[in-house]
Amino acid sequence: MDIRAAEISAILKDQIKNFGKEAEVSEVGQVLSVGDGIARVYGLDNIQAGEMVEFENGTRGMALNLETDNVGIVIFGADREIKEGQTVKRTRAIVDAPVGKGLLGRVVDALGNPIDGKGPIQGAERKRVDVKAPGIIPRKSVHEPMATGLKAIDALIPIGRGQRELIIGDRQTGKTAIALDTILNQKPLNVAGAPESQKLYCVYVAVGQKRSTVAQFVKVLEEQGALEYSIVVAATASDPAPMQYLAPFTGCTMGEYFRDNAMHAVIIYDDLSKQAVAYRQMSLLLRRPPGREAYPGDVFYLHSRLLERAAKLNDSQGNGSLTALPVIETQANDVSAYIPTNVISITDGQIFLETDLFFQGIRPAVNVGLSVSRVGSSAQTKAMKKVAGKIKGELAQYREMAAFAQFGSDLDASTQRLLNRGSRLTELLKQPQFSPLKMEEQVVVIWAGTNGYLDPLPLGKVRAFEDGLLSLLRGQHADILNTIRDTRDLSDETAGKLKSIVEGYAKTFA
């Protein structure tokens, strides 16, 4: 091997020329103890609350407890590689996440890193995950409908863009199914070329769920063509508690990007009970004093600061909105437990799902008596308002009468008629999964129910009547559906046309 002196001198000259005097100064601390996803670190005197830190092996963490002699850090990842005595480096950045349209169609973890194997996220900017909610002045009252495609909800418990509506019920009562149907129902709004004021982007945050469940959820979204306008944030049961705590905030930041840029989004937190459990675990390990049910004293603030970020902004702010659908799981229908009462008091209404109704075959298993939307009919179109007012009253009377009817069999004709109508309307509100209905189709079906066209039918034929009527209208009378959709009203003229069609159909159906 021959050594060329000229070559060596050229390399040396180049290195001397590019020699920089800058030295990187980073504040470091030392790990005192580590375990259960918590590290105690000495020496980070100037660290900020909520700041991201980096351990020697590249694992990240967040400073939560700032004490006199040490800092309590929650670790976003496995703590097996972290040892006592290792150095911890400040990043000088509060925890943030990527936001933007580049996230649509992707599955990410609680820090915004892609976990779907589709490569890095393109063109995303970064925003802090825990920011202040909009104040009173930038907001506007909720007035646009956020359709779920479910008759029982859109007619009786309407949700508006910018509202927070809680979905609450025991396990296996169809809470996630309602959320999934809501996402699928936005497909017609998100067609290519539609105006941004019409589109509704969806963010689904899975907290503490099985990986198989999340994979199945994503598969359904993909098959139904709904993933392209959705973002999935997953912190599964096998992820550390800090990730489960952070995921809802990360998802909310992604949703806020749409809200603040004159667009609309809906975010589903599935579910916040598991986030509260993860937060309780972290707090107890950080030796914060426990309160009721061993939750820390600020668990109410945990959920209120998250849900207050859902808002309908006014014209000067761009008219954007972020709608929140938090999910809470109860134990044996106990809605008076700590976390359920907290979230009920924060939200603008709740949808109660009951196990008994679910097993009776009433699905979605919504208890329309206990469920409420505090925004009410201001989040409905005129057409839906006209037909929904009647169905609410009739179902309320039916529930009252059904309780009395159990005691005696000799009922007068009017009571019998009321019970008959109520049972048909209850049957009408049933709906299979993955089959959301458009607003105009719901209006027509409910109009037929409240005007007595279902009364002569046996209960088992109600579904067939509804399906047949809708296929007739879609095929031969699409103009009626289009009129209701475009005017958002059910005029006397349209109602007259509808009456003759439904009467004709009822004769042939019988």
Swiss-Prot record:
The record marks S371 as: Required for activity. It is found in: Cell inner membrane. Pfam families: ATP-synt_ab, ATP-synt_ab_C, ATP-synt_ab_N. Its main location: membrane. It catalyses: ATP + H2O + 4 H(+)(in) = ADP + phosphate + 5 H(+)(out). Keywords: ATP synthesis, ATP-binding, Cell inner membrane, Cell membrane, CF(1), Hydrogen ion transport, Ion transport, Membrane, Nucleotide-binding, Translocase, Transport. Its EC number is 7.1.2.2. GO terms for molecular function: ADP binding; ATP binding; proton-transporting ATP synthase activity, rotational mechanism. CDD domains: ATP-synt_F1_alpha_C, ATP-synt_F1_alpha_N, F1-ATPase_alpha_CD. It is a peripheral membrane protein. Coiled coil: none annotated. ATP binds at G169, D170, R171, Q172, T173, G174, K175, T176. One of its GO terms (cellular component) is proton-transporting ATP synthase complex. The keyword Chaperone does not apply. InterPro entries: ATP_synth_asu-like_sf (IPR023366), ATP_synth_asu_C (IPR000793), ATP_synth_asu_C_sf (IPR038376), ATP_synth_F1_a_nt-bd_dom (IPR033732), ATP_synth_F1_asu (IPR005294), ATPase_a/bsu_AS (IPR020003), ATPase_F1/V1/A1_a/bsu_N (IPR004100), ATPase_F1/V1/A1_a/bsu_N_sf (IPR036121). Produces ATP from ADP in the presence of a proton gradient across the membrane. The alpha chain is a regulatory subunit. Belongs to the ATPase alpha/beta chains family. HAMAP family: ATP_synth_alpha_bact. F-type ATPases have 2 components, CF(1) - the catalytic core - and CF(0) - the membrane proton channel. CF(1) has five subunits: alpha(3), beta(3), gamma(1), delta(1), epsilon(1). CF(0) has three main subunits: a(1), b(2) and c(9-12). The alpha and beta chains form an alternating ring which encloses part of the gamma chain. CF(1) is attached to CF(0) by a central stalk formed by the gamma and epsilon chains, while a peripheral stalk is formed by the delta and b chains. This is ATP synthase subunit alpha. It comes from Nitrobacter winogradskyi (strain ATCC 25391 / DSM 10237 / CIP 104748 / NCIMB 11846 / Nb-255).
